[in-house]
Structures are given as structure tokens and as C-alpha cells.
């Protein structure tokens, strides 16, 4: 067996099928991706309610915003990132829409002062929080917290429905390619492949298709069937427990601060400098621990500063307590020697 931590999910199958996330969510619509979900939600609002302007937080996955550019709606950024306590400066008028983000499952903008704007909350990093806030709508990607190749969702209001979205051939083919990548990664971790080159090639080719509007589709039916086998609540609960365990193992240091204490997404470190972040990241990769940076390619200076200091370390349900302790110990050992 090859021991690697982080990066993309390998294929996982479960017969438990006990998720309340799907069974107890009225008006939940499944899409190929999170960006397809928000695209179709905005499209619905434009045609049905006359939405004119939408605001996205400046610190965000900008590929999602670009996917929505062709819609007949003005798109703006409002200043906000999860380490800045920015007040929301927004034109609170009828016909305006504000997208808020539950960042890493730990922080989101306070929109209590907004009385007229429609609020849409992105719960990608905290799937089980859907419906818990006063937002008008919820959407997200499923593939950040769950081992599934494609998937997004949108929760509408009662009696609202999408009428013109279907499954596309490109969405189906991309799902199949992503599945091949996940199967190949499983083989790689079992030491049945000489290298990770093949599965990485399939992953990268599939990921490129997410930017293509030909994947503006409902969730492929095969993906829905796979999703229904996953014990979603169990996965996220285990991830929370692992992250809490990892945090308890970390020794205090002035080199970084932990941004999250209770979430089901990942361990989020905010490093003192970009140099510390980059050096720690390289050290972890050298030890087969592959952290993520959320999100690259920021536009505004404050957001670039955060992008350059943040590190997201996976301690999810894939890993045992012993493996989580190993990851935390590696972080500790790095700072012992600097």
C-alpha cells in the first residue's frame, strides 16, 4: 500500500445509503457541479423575478464567477474574505442578489442589515448547514466534502422549479472520466500502478470540462445513484472528529494560527508569511502530504495576501486517527527545525 494524504478522492463505495441530506431536503435540485447550480439559479431569478445585479465576495473561486458571465445580469465583487471583518457594502435594492460563502465551514458575512437584496449562500464547505441560516437560497458543490467525481446542488423555495435543464452527453462523459481517475487512484494507492501519471491525466482532463458550458447539466443519473450509497453524515462527522484530533496534536507556535476549531472540511492554517507557507507546503509534499490552497488566482491585494498565506490540510474520513496524528506530527516536526 502507498501512503499519501490529501489531493483528490479515490473511488469509495458504500451500501449504507443512510444519508438524510438527500431524503429530508425538500426542493433540492442536483446538478453536474456547483457552478452549474448557481448559474441556473441566477438564470431562474433573472427570468422569474427580474434580478439585475449579483455580488460575489472578492475572495472566492473565480472560475464559478466566470461561468456565470454570459448571463444577462450585472456581476460585481464586494470586499470580503474570512480573515477580514469587512462590513458588507452593498446596494440593498429590489432586484439585487448577494452571494455569501460559508468559508471553510467557519465564517460567513453578516447580512442582517440587508432587507431588500436576495441572499444566496454557498455551503460547499459545510454541506450539513444547508437551510440553517436566513438565506433565501442555498447552493454548493458536493465533491469537496464527498468522494464523488461530479455534483452540485441548489435548494429552491417551495413550489419553485427548474424547467429547462437536462443531462448532457458531455456531463455524462466527464463523470465517466472522473470515475476512471478515481478507480486508477485506488489502484495507485494499492501499489498496482508504477506512478500517479495516468490517474492525474484523467483528473486534469475531466477538471478542464467543468469550465465548459456543455456541462451545464443536471447531475448524471449514474452519479445520483452513486451519491445515494454514501453515508454523507457519517463521512462529515468523522472528518470533524479527525480535524479536532489533529488540532489537539499541534503544538503552539507563532508561525501560524488555526482558523478553524470545528468544521467538517479541512484543517485551515493561516501562516505568518508567504515564505513560511511555501516552505511548510514543500516539506509536507516531500512527505506525501498534499495540502490545498483555496483559492489561487485571487484578484484583489488583500485577497492575494490571504491566498499566499493559507494552507488547507486534509484530515478527512479517509484517514484513521493514527494517520491524522502522523500528519499533525509532521507539521510539528517541521517547526522544530526552523
List each language-model region with its residue ranges.
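Conserved glycine-rich beta-strand-loop-beta hairpin in the small C-terminal domain of fold type I
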Residues: 214-247, 256-270
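Conserved PLP-anchoring active-site segment centered on the Schiff-base-forming lysine
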Residues: 43-92
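N-terminal "arm"/small-domain region of PLP-dependent enzymes with the aminotransferase-like
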Residues: 1-23, 193, 197-217
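Conserved PLP-binding catalytic core of the aspartate aminotransferase-like
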Residues: 254-301
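PLP-dependent enzyme catalytic core of the Aspartate aminotransferase-like
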Residues: 286, 298-338
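Active-site phosphate-binding strand-loop segment of PLP-dependent enzymes
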Residues: 80-164, 173
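Conserved PLP-binding active-site segment in aminotransferase class I/II-type PLP enzymes
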Residues: 1-50, 92-93, 226, 231-237, ...
